[in-house]
């Protein structure tokens, strides 16, 4: 890597905010450079740096996404899956990891039995003997048992594979100092290059998704699926407590960020945001 490239990227990536908004300062600096005699060579130099930043950032982003995913899937299929399946099937008699799985299984079995009786009563199914009904219920119970055994083993595999993928991701972040600086500079340039309307639109979209009026339903779905993914009990009190506190904290942090940082960097974007949000 050339030294001029790294120095340029590092200065841009860790540039501090001053009393003058960065959008105004960057515009004035750009106008000043265009008046200099060697402005043409500097423009070519900046274009090369920008092209290098874009290519390097995209490669690093692809690396951050694909490598942990590949590690996750490979370890889950080739390492954890055979070991856990062998241990669970041969040495473990339990079907469920938690009470939430039991409640769902019992509810499905009860609904299946009620469906059989309902179809017989309305004439959609021919009358069945109690022995036949018990046999169908038993087959359904065996099917549910196999399903929840698979769900339990998958949850353990998911936990171990995700931990390994997280360690891989953290290692890539920890060892990618130069790439992180380039990526940060690229993201800054990408954000500052957006129009004020686009910035305000993204801010409103982000806040409405994560801390908006309807965000509680989304958080509930995410938490339930996350707990189920790792085989943890779906505690409704814990879920509702999280929904009642975390979006509020996130909204407070976001408003502080607008007041403390974005108002200095791009005050016009903040003004546009307030106008669009009214």
Swiss-Prot record:
One Pfam family cited in the UniProt record for this chain: CemA
Membrane topology per record: Multi-pass membrane protein
One BP annotation, GO: potassium ion transport
InterPro entries named in the record: CemA
Catalytic activity: K(+)(in) + H(+)(out) = K(+)(out) + H(+)(in)
Molecular functions per Gene Ontology: antiporter activity; proton transmembrane transporter activity
Transmembrane residue ranges: 60-80, 163-183, 201-221, 239-259
Keyword annotations of the record: Antiport, Chloroplast, Hydrogen ion transport, Ion transport, Membrane, Plastid, Plastid inner membrane, Potassium, Potassium transport, Transmembrane, Transmembrane helix, Transport
Coiled-coil stretches noted in the UniProt entry, renumbered to this chain: none
Protein location: Plastid, Chloroplast inner membrane
GO CC annotations, alphabetized: chloroplast inner membrane
Family named by the database record: Belongs to the CemA family.
Function per UniProt: Contributes to K(+)/H(+) antiport activity by supporting proton efflux to control proton extrusion and homeostasis in chloroplasts in a light-dependent manner to modulate photosynthesis. Prevents excessive induction of non-photochemical quenching (NPQ) under continuous-light conditions. Indirectly promotes efficient inorganic carbon uptake into chloroplasts.
Protein name: Potassium/proton antiporter CemA
Lineage: Eukaryota, Cryptophyceae, Pyrenomonadales, Geminigeraceae, Guillardia
